[in-house]
């Protein structure tokens, strides 16, 4: 019983010691953890287009991009998104570069006399709505071949003339000009004699406008965005994602986005890459803005044409200035128009049904009360009309007939095509301003586009009706194209508390690990537990570094090939900036690890205690990304503590290195050591001199306290006289006057010699006193601590005895177990050996038994 209690006490003591030792947690640095954070840096583009803009602005695309699935849940937002914002800005720059208005001039703000006739002002003749259902036109309709479909008439134009000076000195010149009526604003009064009206250009309120300096085509271009090394692009692959919420549970990682088209249009999105066999809606998180992706099953498309032929002649205004306008020669241009192919009716019904089932939608569920609606009149033409670009020309289409046809409104004109006109002065879609472009080029203009999305605002009205109002926000197109992406910065450095403390391990040969090709390979462990991911940090960190180096090399190669073309462009600067950003990130990570003393280590234990003991990771169930989100607010403090600890360790190592120099005898004779010795000697001499002065002053003060005494007097008790007798043979006549009053033949040594002996005695007395004081102080300290030390020895003696007894008991138990095992093994071996002997004798006896059996058979 007593022995069991002792064993229990030993176990409790060992457990207590382990708990005391293991309670302290230290910061451990892990390199290569699969974690990230949101980033906002310039991306670079890659394209296969070999036109001028694609060659100058982007790098060649090689289609070598893979997506790696991640078992994580991540938040995405199509509106608060770095990639979409950069795409909007870059496409705007592309738009300005391709259809470049590059000359700024003062608007033509002179009074013009214009002749507005009835025939000139006719754009769409007023027609009486027919109750009979009109068949939609198709590819085989005769009016398509003849450009003479019902309702399409000539453009609305105005003929004007005005006077200006400046071309010749002190002379006026009259100019004749033809304008689209939408570009001028006229007074209500008309001169009855000439039938002319005073008109002005409608942009005269703008102080400065920009005119196109050359005619360009706006051809479709496909390009993708790529992240620089050290960064990644995450994509939401969840069909429930609606642009804002809920969080995406199916995430994949890549280095580049999908290919996307350069789109610039209102109302509809054309040639998008997000079309699927379903209709889905991206809804803004705070207002009613939406972007609706149409089902590609319905094959929706739009075909636009500007028939006719004309000649454009510029006019010269003053010296050296030219203003391009539209004088028409021989024939006025026919009106442009667009017709819509595909099953639009069913596609729009599916849009309504999808809206009614959307979780953000709170309006009526009856799709008959959900209608498509054009924006209110009175706003910019780009809002009122559907604005698109066809081969560099800007089409403004009146969609009234089309909406009547889609909604099947009774007593209205319903057609699957829309009349359009081309404008020379347009409002910019990304920045506030106006651009003046060249007149349309000669010849017929045609373009064919696939309709993939609708830009709309959802207007709910008292839960009874809902209007899907078409919008002119061109930027929404790129929120649909790239809204399922987000840019993240890989943060391979992680912190976590462990019970391990830093030590200095022996440098051994590093073990080889399996090399995994690719930068994003280590992100495959993003969805596994922290403990499992930590076991593969060596391979992950090598994958990370190798991938960064590989990406850097690939980016450097393509930049070198394109450097002559990229030199003077804005996007070329962005690409170089992306590469510099990647290098800065890599060097920053390595410098940070080095400042913590963790360079070239995958798991680095430190001496910094973990500050928040209540915050500990769940190594079996928590991912590194979840853990990093919890401790991200501690990173600054942890980093500062690690730097301070590393500085202190370097200081300690320096001091230790200085002490190590004393164990080598030859270092004692080093020149720097001798200089130190001389310094120490000078300090000692100066100290002795100061001490002597202090002692002398103290002695003088002590003697002055006893009464006045001449400084150089010598009392019998102070200086012992040494008598010296004079030579008796010296004549008495040699005595001088100075000998009078003396003691006859006695003389004494000077007092300075005795004073030196006095100082020596005083110094010895002082040192003896200091020694006695120190000895008494140490004796008293030892006497004070002796009871405490005695109690500590008395307390430790049984504990040590218990530990010794426990160790002896464990040793005896091991010996008994070994002895029992040895005896058991010996017995088993004897039994096996006996069995083998019996089997052997039986085998050897087989011939004898056969012979005996044969003998018995013969008898």
From Swiss-Prot:
Pfam families: GP120 (PF00516), GP41 (PF00517)
Region (Disordered): 726-745
Region annotation (V4) ranges: 397-420
Cysteine pairs bridged by disulfides in the record: 45-58, 102-213, 109-204, 114-160, 226-256, 236-248, 304-338, 390-447, 397-420
Gene3D superfamilies (UniProt xref): 1.10.287.210, Human immunodeficiency virus 1, Gp160, envelope glycoprotein
Record-level GO cellular component terms: host cell endosome membrane; host cell plasma membrane; membrane; viral envelope; virion membrane
Positions of region (V3): 304-337
Entry comment on modification after translation: Specific enzymatic cleavages in vivo yield mature proteins. Envelope glycoproteins are synthesized as an inactive precursor that is heavily N-glycosylated and processed likely by host cell furin in the Golgi to yield the mature SU and TM proteins. The cleavage site between SU and TM requires the minimal sequence [KR]-X-[KR]-R. Palmitoylation of the transmembrane protein and of Env polyprotein (prior to its proteolytic cleavage) is essential for their association with host cell membrane lipid rafts. Palmitoylation is therefore required for envelope trafficking to classical lipid rafts, but not for viral replication.
Residues spanned by motif YXXV motif: 708-711
Role, per record: The surface protein gp120 (SU) attaches the virus to the host lymphoid cell by binding to the primary receptor CD4. This interaction induces a structural rearrangement creating a high affinity binding site for a chemokine coreceptor like CXCR4 and/or CCR5. This peculiar 2 stage receptor-interaction strategy allows gp120 to maintain the highly conserved coreceptor-binding site in a cryptic conformation, protected from neutralizing antibodies. Since CD4 also displays a binding site for the disulfide-isomerase P4HB/PDI, a P4HB/PDI-CD4-CXCR4-gp120 complex may form. The surface protein gp120 is a ligand for CD209/DC-SIGN and CLEC4M/DC-SIGNR, which are respectively found on dendritic cells (DCs), and on endothelial cells of liver sinusoids and lymph node sinuses. These interactions allow capture of viral particles at mucosal surfaces by these cells and subsequent transmission to permissive cells. DCs are professional antigen presenting cells, critical for host immunity by inducing specific immune responses against a broad variety of pathogens.
Protein's name according to its UniProt entry: Envelope glycoprotein gp160
Native source organism of the sequence: Human immunodeficiency virus type 2 subtype A (isolate CAM2) (HIV-2)
Taxonomic lineage from the root: Viruses, Riboviria, Pararnavirae, Artverviricota, Revtraviricetes
């Amino acid at each position: 019983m007593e022995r069991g209690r002792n064993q229990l006490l030993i176990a409790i003591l060992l457990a207590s010691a382990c708990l005391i030792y293991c309670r302290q947690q230290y910061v451990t640095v892990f390199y290569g953890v699969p974690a990230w954070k949101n980033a906002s840096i310039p991306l670079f583009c890659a394209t296969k287009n070999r036109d001028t803009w694609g060659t100058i602005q982007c790098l060649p695309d090689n289609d070598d991009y893979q997506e790696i699935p991640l078992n994580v849940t991540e938040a995405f937002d199509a509106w608060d998104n770095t990639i979409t914002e950069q795409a909007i800005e870059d496409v705007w720059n592309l738009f300005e570069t391709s259809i470049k208005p590059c000359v700024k001039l003062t608007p033509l703000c002179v009074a013009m006399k214009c002749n507005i006739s009835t025939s000139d002002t006719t754009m769409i003749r007023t027609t009486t709505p027919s109750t009979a259902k009109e068949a939609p036109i198709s590819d085989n309709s005769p009016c398509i071949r003849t450009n003479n479909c019902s309702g399409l008439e000539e453009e609305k134009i105005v003929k004007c003339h005005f006077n200006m000076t400046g071309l010749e000195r002190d002379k006026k010149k009259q100019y004749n000009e033809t304008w689209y009526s939408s570009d001028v604003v006229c007074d209500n009064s008309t001169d009855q004699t000439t039938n002319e009206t005073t008109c002005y250009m409608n942009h005269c309120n703008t102080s400065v406008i920009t005119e196109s300096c050359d005619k360009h085509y706006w051809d479709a271009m496909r390009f993708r965005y790529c992240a620089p090394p050290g960064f990644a692009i995450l994509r939401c692959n969840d069909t429930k994602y609606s642009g804002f919420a809920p969080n995406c549970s199916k995430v994949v990682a890549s280095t580049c986005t999908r290919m996307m088209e350069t789109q610039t249009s209102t109302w509809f999105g054309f040639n998008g890459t997000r079309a699927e066999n379903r209709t889905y809606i991206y809804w803004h998180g705070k207002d009613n803005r939406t972007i609706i992706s149409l089902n590609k099953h319905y094959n929706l498309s739009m075909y636009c044409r500007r028939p006719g032929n004309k000649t454009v002649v510029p006019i010269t205004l003053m010296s050296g200035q030219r203003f391009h306008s539209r004088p028409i020669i021989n024939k006025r241009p026919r009106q442009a128009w667009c017709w819509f192919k595909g099953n639009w009716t069913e596609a729009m019904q599916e849009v309504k049904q999808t809206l009614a089932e959307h979780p953000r939608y709170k309006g009526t569920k009856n799709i008959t009360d959900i209608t498509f609606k054009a924006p209110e009149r009175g706003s910019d033409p780009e809002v009122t009309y559907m604005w698109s670009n066809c081969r560099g020309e800007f089409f403004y289409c009146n969609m009234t007939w089309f909406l009547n046809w889609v909604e099947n409104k009774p007593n209205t004109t319903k057609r699957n095509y829309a009349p359009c006109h081309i404008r020379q002065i347009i409002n910019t879609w990304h920045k506030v301003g106006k651009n003046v472009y060249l007149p349309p080029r000669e010849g017929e203009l045609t373009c064919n586009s696939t309709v993939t999305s609708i830009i709309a605002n959802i207007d709910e009205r008292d839960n009874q009706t809902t209007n899907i109002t078409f919008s002119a926000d061109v930027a929404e197109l790129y929120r649909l194209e790239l809204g399922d992406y987000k840019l993240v910065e890989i943060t391979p450095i992680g912190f976590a508390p462990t019970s391990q403390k830093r030590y200095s391990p022996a440098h051994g040969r590093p073990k080889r690990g399996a090399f995994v090709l690719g930068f994003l390979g280590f992100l495959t462990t993003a969805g596994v537990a922290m403990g499992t991911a930590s076991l593969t940090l060596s391979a992950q960190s090598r994958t990370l570094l190798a991938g960064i180096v590989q990406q850097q090399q690939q980016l450097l190669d393509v930049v070198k090939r394109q450097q002559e073309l990229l030199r003077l462009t804005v996007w070329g600067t962005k690409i170089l900036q992306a590469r510099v950003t990647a290098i800065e990130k890599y060097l920053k990570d390595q410098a940070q690890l080095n400042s913590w003393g963790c360079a070239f280590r995958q798991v680095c234990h430190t001496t910094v205690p973990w500050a928040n003991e209540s915050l500990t990771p769940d190594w079996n169930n928590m991912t590194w990304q979840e853990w990093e989100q919890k401790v991200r607010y501690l990173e600054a403090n942890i980093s500062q503590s690690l730097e301070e600890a590393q500085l202190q360790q370097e200081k300690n190592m320096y001091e230790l290195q200085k002490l190590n120099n004393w164990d080598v005898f030859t270092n004692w004779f080093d020149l720097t050591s001798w200089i130190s010795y001389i310094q120490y000697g000078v300090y000692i001499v100066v100290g002795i001199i100061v001490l002597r002065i202090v002692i002398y002053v103290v002695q003088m003060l002590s003697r002055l306290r006893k009464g006045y005494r001449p400084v150089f007097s010598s009392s019998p008790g102070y200086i012992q006289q040494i008598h010296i007798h004079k030579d008796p043979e010296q004549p008495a006549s040699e005595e001088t006057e100075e000998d009078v009053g003396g003691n006859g033949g006695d003389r004494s040594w000077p007092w300075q010699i005795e004073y030196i002996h006095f100082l020596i005695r005083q110094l010895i007395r002082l040192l003896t006193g200091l020694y006695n004081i120190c000895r008494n102080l140490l004796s008293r300290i030892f006497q004070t601590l002796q009871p405490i030390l005695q109690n500590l020895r008395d307390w430790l003696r049984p504990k040590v005895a218990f530990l010794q007894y426990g160790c002896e008991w464990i040793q005896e138990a091991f010996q008994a177990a070994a002895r029992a095992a040895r005896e058991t093994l010996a017995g088993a071996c004897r039994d096996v050996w006996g069995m083998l002997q019996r089997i052997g004798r039986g085998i050897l006896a087989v011939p004898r038994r056969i012979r005996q059996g044969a003998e018995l058979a013969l008898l």
